[in-house]
Amino acid sequence: MNLLFDFTVDKAAKTVFITREFDADLSLVWDAFTTAEILDQWVAPKPWTSKTKFMDFKVGGRRFYAMVSPEGQERWAIQKYTSISPKTNFKMFNAFADKDENPELPGSDWDYTFSEQNGKTIVHITIYNESLARMEKMIEMGFTEGFKMSMNNLENLLAGLWKK
C-alpha cells in the first residue's frame, strides 16, 4: 500500500513542511507522538535509539531525551509543549541541549496537526526555524533522511499495534 509522504523544505520561509499518512486509528497515532514509551520505540533513525529522561505532555510541560548511537554517544534535546488540543494538534519548541538540560539556541517551533480520512490518519508537521543557518545545518546533518527513517519506523510499529 502506498501511503502519502510529502517532505518539502522552504528555505525562504525557514520552514519544513511534512505530511505523512498512516494506516492506523487517529488515537493510536496521537499516542505514538505523545507518549514517551511509544516515542522511544520509533523516533530515532536506526541504528540509533531514543531514551526519554522525562516527559510531561501538557502545556508548559517538557520532554528531555537523547538520541543514542550504537557506540553510546548521546545527543540530547529538549522540547517544551506550548499548545495542546487533544487528538487534533500540539505545538512545541525544540532545541538541542547538553546533558544538563541547557538548550543550544536557536531552536525550532514544531506544529503537529492530526486528522482522519477514509480510515487513515494524516499528520501534518510544520517546522519553523529561528534561523536559516540552523535549518541548513539540521538538513546537512541528515535530518531529511533521518526523519524519513523515523516515519517508516513508526509505520512498522503501528502495523504491529493496529489490527483492523
Model-derived features with residue positions:
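Short beta-edge strand/loop motif at the mouth of beta-sheet-based domains
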Residues: 17-18, 37-74
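Helix-adjacent hinge/juxtasegments
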Residues: 62-93
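A short, structured loop/turn motif at beta-sheet edges
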Residues: 26-27, 56-58, 82-89, 113-122
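Hydrophobic ligand-binding cavity/cleft-lining segments
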Residues: 1-49
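Hydrophobic/aromatic beta-strand elements that line small-molecule binding cavities or substrate pockets
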Residues: 20, 52-53, 77-83, 108-115
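Hydrophobic pocket/interface hotspot
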Residues: 29, 39, 63, 81, ...
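Beta-strand/loop substructures that line and gate deep hydrophobic ligand-binding cavities in soluble
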Residues: 15, 93, 99-145
